[in-house]
Regions:
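Alpha-helical nucleic-acid-binding subdomain
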Residues: 104, 109, 229-495, 501-512, ...
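Non-catalytic, well-ordered alpha-helical scaffold segments
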Residues: 19, 81-84, 185, 196, ...
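Phosphate/oxyanion-binding active-site loops and adjacent basic polyanion-contact surfaces
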Residues: 183, 187, 217-221, 297, ...
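Amphipathic, well-packed alpha-helical segments that form the structural scaffold of globular domains
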Residues: 192, 196, 200-203, 226, ...
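P-loop NTPase Walker
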Residues: 1-4, 9-36, 143, 162, ...
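A structural signal for short, well-ordered beta-strand segments and their strand-loop junctions
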Residues: 86-88, 149, 409-410, 447, ...
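Conserved helicase motor core of SF1/SF2 NTP-dependent helicases
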Residues: 234, 239, 248-292, 459-466, ...
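Extended, charged low-complexity regulatory segments
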Residues: 1-188, 192-197
Length: 704
C-alpha cells in the first residue's frame, strides 16, 4: 500500500476512536448539566425548610453546583485537540490514547489517559535507548473533532508487529515549522524528555529551570503547574498557583495555556500587577529602575514612613484646668521616635501614639508643678491622662499628627527632593536622590513597574488599620464559584518567569505571596537586564527562605530559532556569556538573517518595507522590535498597515515572546538604553522562528 493510502487509512482508524471519545464527552457534559440543574433546584427547595435543614440543603447545593460547574468548565476547555497521542505497547499489545484529560466509557474502560497520569509518562520519556515497552508512539493532530494527520516514532523496530503501519515525519519537527499565533500554544503533544523530567519533578522546595532562548522554559513551567495541580490538587489547589511574568504583553501571550489544559485555579500577574488594585506598564529609564529596585530602598521607605507627614501639626497646645500644656516640634519628634522604637506598623499604633503623647503632656504638667514649687501626684497624673485622653481637641490633633498612612501617599512625599534626601541619609547618592525625586514627581504615565514593589513594601510597613467588627452579614457567594478572600495574597505554588530580571525589591514583593509555597523559577542569566546579578541572586535566595530542597534543570536545545538566526544572536552576545551558557539550535532552514544598512532619514520607509515583505512571506505573526523609547514612533510608522499579525513591541516587552518573523529596528539603540544592552539585544535577536531582518544605521552594533 502506498504512503498516502496508508496515511489515510491510519487517519480513518484514529478518527473512529476520536468519534467514540467525543460521543462520550457529550454524554458527560449532559450529565453535568443535569447535576447543575438539580443543584439549583435544591437551593429553591431549601427556602421552605427549617433552619437546620435549610443550611444542610444549601451546603449540598453549593457542593453540587460547584462540582458541576468545574466539570463543565473542564470539558469545555479540553474540547479542542482533546486527544493528541497514542502508545502501542509491545508486551501487552495494548493501545493507550493520551489526551488533555482522562475519559472512561460507561463501562469504565479507558478511552483517553490524562497526559499528567503516570500511565502517560512514556509518551514523553520513552526513547529508542529506553523504549519503556513502547513499540510505536503516535502524535495525532486534530482540529475540533476531525483528525488532520498522524506522525509516528518507532522505538522498538524488532518488536513491530506485522501489519502495524508507520507514517509521518516526526511530530516535533512538524510543530517547529508551524506558524505562530497571537497566543502561546500548549506543547502537550510535543514535550521532549528533558522537558518532561522538569515537569514531573517533585513539588517540594524550589525547582529552577535555566536555559537559553527557545528551549521551552516558559511552556515547561506552565505545564509543570498543570501537572502539579493534577497530581497534588488537595495540597496546592486550595490557595492556588500564582504565575508572575515580566509584562502585560507576556501574560496575555501565555494566558490561554493553562485554561487549555483545564486549569483555572491559576492567577497570572505581570510585575506591574502583582499588588492588588495596581496596573503599571510604564518602564523607568534603566538608571532609575536600578535605584528603585535596589534593596537600599527598604531603608529609605522605612525612614520616609516614620517621618512626620508634611501636613502634620508641628506643635500641640492644649489647656488643662488653669494650665496650658505645650509640646514643641522637637518634643513631638521624640514622641514619634519613641512610638516607632517600640515596633509595629504605624496604622496599628495610633493607640500607642495617643498613650505616648498623653505621657509626654503629663511630663510637661509635672515640670510646671515643680517650677511652681509643687508636685504632680501619681493620682493627679492618672487623672490628667484620663481627662485629656477623652477630650475632642486632643483626638482632633491625634488624627492629624498620626493619620492613617497610605503607600501611595508616602511615595508621593518623596517627590520633595529635600524630604527624600532626609529619608535616604547615606543610602543614596545626591545624583540618585535627584533622579528619584524627579521620577516620583512625574506621574504623567502613572506608576512605573518598579514603583509597584515600593508600594507593596510600604503596604507591609504601614500595616492595616484596626477596624471595628461589622455586624453586617457578608454577601452570600455565588453558587458554584470558589471565592478567594479579598486581599488574600498567599499561594500554594509560585511560578516566576524571566526571573533573571527581577530586582531585589521585586523579589521581596513576590516572596510575600509565597511564604509557605513551593516554587518554580525560570530564567537565563545571559538574558538578564538587571545590572547586578549577584545582588538579585541574593534577594532570590532570601525569597526562598529556609527551603533546603532546591533542584536545578538546564534545558540546552533551542527549538525556536533556526541555526542561522541563532548564530547571529550568539555573535551579538560574544564576551557576555560562556559558550556552555548558550543553547544549541536544532534545525536549519537555509534562510540567513538579513542585516540591512540604512540611514536614520530612511528608517521609517525601511521599517514599512521590511514588515510588508515578511507579512507577504510568512503565514503567522511578524514582530517589530525597537528600543523602549522608540516604540511609539515605530508604531506610528506602521499605523497604516492594518494587519492583526503585525505586533510592535519594545525591547524589554519582547521577553518570552516569539514570532514567525522579526524586524529589529536599530540594534545600537537597544545597546545604548542600559548597561545590559547587549543582553537585551540578544533577547530581541532570538524572537524569530523563521526569518529575521535587522535594520542598522550604526554599523558598530555587531562585534567583529
Amino acid at each position: 500500500m502506498s504512503e498516502p493510502r496508508i496515511r489515510r487509512a491510519e487517519i480513518a482508524r484514529e478518527q473512529a476512536h476520536i468519534d467514540r471519545v467525543y460521543t462520550r464527552l457529550a454524554e458527560l457534559r449532559s450529565q453535568a448539566q443535569k447535576m447543575l440543574a438539580k443543584g439549583y433546584q435544591l437551593g429553591h427547595g431549601a427556602q421552605r425548610e427549617a433552619v437546620f435543614e435549610q443550611a444542610s440543603m444549601l451546603f449540598e447545593r453549593d457542593m453540587m453546583v460547584y462540582h458541576a460547574n468545574q466539570t463543565l468548565q473542564t470539558l469545555d476547555a479540553e474540547y479542542e485537540g482533546l486527544v493528541f497521542g497514542r502508545l502501542d505497547h509491545a508486551a501487552s499489545g495494548e493501545a493507550v490514547h493520551v489526551g488533555r484529560l482522562g475519559i472512561r466509557d460507561a463501562d469504565f474502560d479507558n478511552l483517553v489517559t490524562d497526559w499528567r497520569a503516570p500511565a502517560a509518562a512514556a509518551f514523553y520519556q520513552a526513547t529508542a535507548e529506553e523504549p519503556m515497552d513502547v513499540v510505536r508512539r503516535r502524535v495525532i493532530r486534530c482540529s475540533g473533532q476531525q483528525v488532520l494527520d498522524v506522525d509516528d516514532d518507532v522505538l522498538m523496530p524488532e518488536s513491530l508487529p506485522d501489519g502495524m503501519a508507520v507514517v509521518g515525519e516526526g511530530a516535533l519537527m512538524a510543530a517547529l515549522g508551524r506558524a505562530r499565533g497571537e497566543h502561546m500554544r500548549d506543547i502537550v503533544a510535543t514535550i521532549q524528555k528533558e522537558q518532561d523530567d522538569v515537569i514531573r519533578a517533585p513539588w517540594q522546595g524550589v525547582t529552577e529551570i535555566t536555559g537559553g532562548p527557545g528551549t521551552g522554559k516558559t511552556a515547561v513551567a506552565l505545564h509543570r503547574a498543570a501537572y502539579l495541580l493534577y497530581r497534588h490538587r488537595k495540597r496546592l489547589g486550595g490557595a492556588g498557583v500564582l504565575v508572575v511574568g515580566p509584562s502585560p504583553v507576556f501574560t496575555n501571550y501565555i494566558s490561554r495555556v493553562l485554561p487549555s489544559m483545564g486549569e483555572t485555579n491559576v492567577e497570572l500577574r505581570s510585575l506591574g500587577t502583582v499588588l492588588d488594585g495596581t496596573a503599571a506598564e510604564h518602564i523607568d529609564p534603566a538608571v532609575v529602575a536600578a535605584v528603585k529596585g535596589s534593596v537600599r530602598m527598604r531603608k529609605v521607605l522605612l525612614r520616609a514612613m516614620r517621618a512626620a507627614p508634611p501636613d502634620a501639626p508641628a506643635q500641640l497646645r492644649i489647656r488643662y484646668r488653669d494650665d496650658v500644656l505645650r509640646l514643641e516640634p522637637a518634643q513631638l519628634d521624640r514622641v514619634r521616635r519613641r512610638v516607632h522604637a517600640r515596633g509595629g506598623p504605624p496604622n496599628r499604633s495610633r493607640v500607642r501614639a495617643a498613650e505616648t503623647l498623653l505621657e509626654a503632656l503629663a511630663d510637661v504638667a509635672e515640670k510646671h508643678a515643680r517650677d511652681d514649687g509643687g508636685e504632680l501626684t501619681p493620682a493627679a497624673r492618672r487623672e490628667l491622662v484620663i481627662e485629656l485622653g477623652e477630650r475632642i481637641d486632643f483626638h482632633r490633633f491625634l488624627v492629624l499628627w498620626w493619620p492613617e498612612l497610605h503607600p501611595a501617599e508616602i511615595l508621593g512625599w518623596l517627590a520633595d527632593e529635600r524630604r527624600l534626601a532626609k529619608a535616604a541619609g547615606s543610602a543614596l547618592t545626591a545624583e540618585e536622590i535627584t533622579l528619584l525625586s524627579t521620577s516620583f514627581a512625574d506621574r504623567s504615565a502613572g506608576y512605573s513597574v518598579a514603583d509597584i514593589a515600593l508600594l507593596d513594601e510600604l503596604r507591609v510597613l504601614v500595616g492595616k488599620p484596626k477596624r471595628r467588627r461589622s455586624a453586617a452579614r457578608p454577601p452570600e457567594p455565588e453558587a458554584g464559584r470558589r471565592q478567594r478572600p479579598e486581599h488574600y495574597d498567599e499561594y500554594s505554588h509560585i511560578v516566576v518567569d524571566e526571573a533573571q530580571d527581577l530586582s531585589p525589591m521585586q523579589w521581596r514583593m513576590v516572596a510575600r505571596r509565597g511564604r509557605y509555597a513551593s516554587w518554580t523559577v525560570v530564567g537565563d542569566p545571559v538574558q538578564s537586564s538587571w545590572p547586578d546579578p549577584a545582588d538579585a541572586e541574593s534577594a532570590a535566595a532570601a525569597a526562598f527562605g529556609g527551603r533546603t530542597t532546591r533542584r536545578r534543570f538546564t534545558l540546552r536545545t533551542n527549538y525556536r530559532n533556526s541555526a542561522e538566526i541563532f548564530a547571529l544572536a550568539a555573535r551579538a552576545v560574544a564576551g557576555q556569556a560562556e559558550q556552555d551558557q548558550l543553547p544549541v539550535a536544532v534545525r536549519r532552514t537555509g534562510l540567513e538573517p538579513q542585516v540591512r544598512p540604512v540611514s536614520q532619514d530612511t528608517m521609517a520607509d525601511e521599517v514599512r518595507m521590511a514588515a510588508g515583505e515578511l507579512l507577504d512571506t510568512v503565514g503567522g505573526t511578524v514582530g517589530v522590535i525597537s528600543a523602549m523609547d522608540r516604540v511609539a514612533t515605530v508604531d506610528k510608522w506602521l499605523a497604516t498597515m492594518a494587519d492583526e499579525r503585525l505586533h510592535v513591541v519594545g525591547s524589554l516587552d519582547a521577553k518570552g515572546l516569539e514570532y514567525d518573523a522579526v524586524v529589529l529596528v536599530e540594534p545600537q539603540g537597544l545597546i545604548d538604553e542600559s548597561v545590559t544592552g547587549r543582553r537585551v539585544l540578544y533577547v530581541a535577536l532570538t524572537r524569530a522562528t523563521q526569518q529575521l531582518i535587522v535594520l542598522a544605521a550604526d554599523p558598530l552594533w555587531l562585534p567583529s
